[in-house]
């Protein structure tokens, strides 16, 4: 798998699939599978049996992973999906920069 371009707590927009256009926060990144879990995106219904943790059981809704290639970083300043570039500042810190407007993430 190639390196995943988003990190936990990034705001992303889905660019393809049934949830195209939805904006959400990355809850977790699965680098070995090349997938990410985004809040309120790709929500699946699961029928849960009662167990020790969940005595009630029933139908639960949870986010399922989607491929990282289906999401792009969302820039709040541009209000659109954008590609990013990496830049090293004078003090040696590495920052991610929006290719459209130059805003740092």
UniProtKB/Swiss-Prot annotation:
<dbReference type="GO" id="GO:0003735">
    <property type="term" value="F:structural constituent of ribosome"/>
</dbReference>
<comment type="similarity">
    <text>Belongs to the universal ribosomal protein uL24 family.</text>
</comment>
<dbReference type="GO" id="GO:0006412">
    <property type="term" value="P:translation"/>
</dbReference>
<dbReference type="InterPro" id="IPR014722">
    <property type="entry name" value="Rib_uL2_dom2"/>
</dbReference>
<dbReference type="GO" id="GO:0005840">
    <property type="term" value="C:ribosome"/>
</dbReference>
<dbReference type="Pfam" id="PF00467">
    <property type="entry name" value="KOW"/>
</dbReference>
<keyword id="KW-0694">RNA-binding</keyword>
<dbReference type="InterPro" id="IPR008991">
    <property type="entry name" value="Translation_prot_SH3-like_sf"/>
</dbReference>
<dbReference type="Pfam" id="PF17136">
    <property type="entry name" value="ribosomal_L24"/>
</dbReference>
<dbReference type="InterPro" id="IPR003256">
    <property type="entry name" value="Ribosomal_uL24"/>
</dbReference>
<dbReference type="InterPro" id="IPR005824">
    <property type="entry name" value="KOW"/>
</dbReference>
<protein>
    <recommendedName>
        <fullName>Large ribosomal subunit protein uL24</fullName>
    </recommendedName>
</protein>
<comment type="function">
    <text>One of the proteins that surrounds the polypeptide exit tunnel on the outside of the subunit.</text>
</comment>
<keyword id="KW-0687">Ribonucleoprotein</keyword>
<keyword id="KW-0699">rRNA-binding</keyword>
<dbReference type="GO" id="GO:1990904">
    <property type="term" value="C:ribonucleoprotein complex"/>
</dbReference>
<dbReference type="GO" id="GO:0019843">
    <property type="term" value="F:rRNA binding"/>
</dbReference>
<dbReference type="InterPro" id="IPR041988">
    <property type="entry name" value="Ribosomal_uL24_KOW"/>
</dbReference>
<comment type="subunit">
    <text>Part of the 50S ribosomal subunit.</text>
</comment>
<comment type="function">
    <text>One of two assembly initiator proteins, it binds directly to the 5'-end of the 23S rRNA, where it nucleates assembly of the 50S subunit.</text>
</comment>
<keyword id="KW-0689">Ribosomal protein</keyword>
């Amino acid at each position: 798998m190639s390196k995943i371009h988003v990190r936990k707590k990034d705001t992303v927009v889905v660019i393809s699939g049934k949830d195209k256009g939805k904006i959400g926060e990355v809850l977790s990144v699965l680098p070995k599978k090349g997938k990410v879990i985004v809040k309120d995106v790709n929500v699946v219904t699961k029928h849960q049996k009662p167990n020790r943790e969940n005595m009630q059981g029933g139908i639960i809704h949870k986010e399922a992973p989607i491929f990282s290639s289906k999401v792009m970083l969302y820039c709040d300043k541009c209000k659109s999906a954008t590609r990013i570039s990496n830049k090293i500042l004078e003090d040696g810190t590495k920052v991610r920069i929006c290719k459209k407007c130059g805003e740092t993430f």
